[in-house]
Amino acid sequence: MRCGPLCRFLWLWPYLSCVEAVPIRKVQDDTKTLIKTIVARINDISHTQSVSSKQRVAGLDFIPGLQPVLSLSRMDQTLAIYQQILNSLHSRNVVQISNDLENLRDLLHLLASSKSCPLPRARGLETFESLGGVLEASLYSTEVVALNRLQAALQDMLRRLDLSPGC
C-alpha cells in the first residue's frame, strides 16, 4: 500500500492549519508603502525634474497620463504599460522601479482577489513593437516623460486606494 502522499500531508497538517491569511489591511498598507517607495526612487533620479508630467512631447503620446477613474483593473493595466516602457529603455535608472512595479501589480491582484474580483493579467501596449524607432531616437526624453507621468499616476493611485476602488 502506498501511503507516501497521505503521510506527507498528515505530517504537514499542523503547519497548514496554523497558517493565517494575510489581513487585507496589511496588503493595502504594503501597497501604499511600495507606491511611496517608487515615488521616492523616481525623485532620486535627478533628471526627472526637468519636464512637467502634463507637458506634451511629440511622439510620446503612447505614455499614459492621468486616468479619470481608476479601478483596480485600470491601475494594473496602467502599471503594465509603464513596466513595458521602462523595460524597453534598458536604463540602469529604471531597473529597480520596473521590478517594484511588478511587485505592486501583484499586490493589486491580492487586493482585487480579496474583493472577489480576480484581475486577468494585464498586457502592455499591443502596438509597442512599432514604437521601437521612437524609443531608440529619444531614450532620454522617453525616460524623463515616462517617469514623470508614472510618478503622477502613482500619487493618484495612492489617493484612490484610500477610497477603496472597485474592480
Swiss-Prot record:
Q: What is its main location?
A: secreted
GO function terms (MF aspect): hormone activity; peptide hormone receptor binding
SUPFAM superfamilies reported for this sequence = 4-helical cytokines
> What does the entry list under GO cellular component?
extracellular space
Q: State the InterPro entries in the record.
A: 4_helix_cytokine-like_core, Leptin
Q: Which GO BP terms sit in this record?
A: activation of protein kinase C activity; adult feeding behavior; bone growth; cellular response to leptin stimulus; energy reserve metabolic process; intestinal absorption; leptin-mediated signaling pathway; lipid metabolic process
- The SS bond pairs are C117-C167
Localization, UniProt: Secreted
**PANTHER family reported in the protein's UniProt record:** LEPTIN
Q: What does this protein do?
A: Key player in the regulation of energy balance and body weight control. Once released into the circulation, has central and peripheral effects by binding LEPR, found in many tissues, which results in the activation of several major signaling pathways. In the hypothalamus, acts as an appetite-regulating factor that induces a decrease in food intake and an increase in energy consumption by inducing anorexinogenic factors and suppressing orexigenic neuropeptides, also regulates bone mass and secretion of hypothalamo-pituitary-adrenal hormones.
Similarity remark: Belongs to the leptin family.
Q: What is this protein called?
A: Leptin
Task: Give the organism, scientific name.
Answer: Canis lupus familiaris
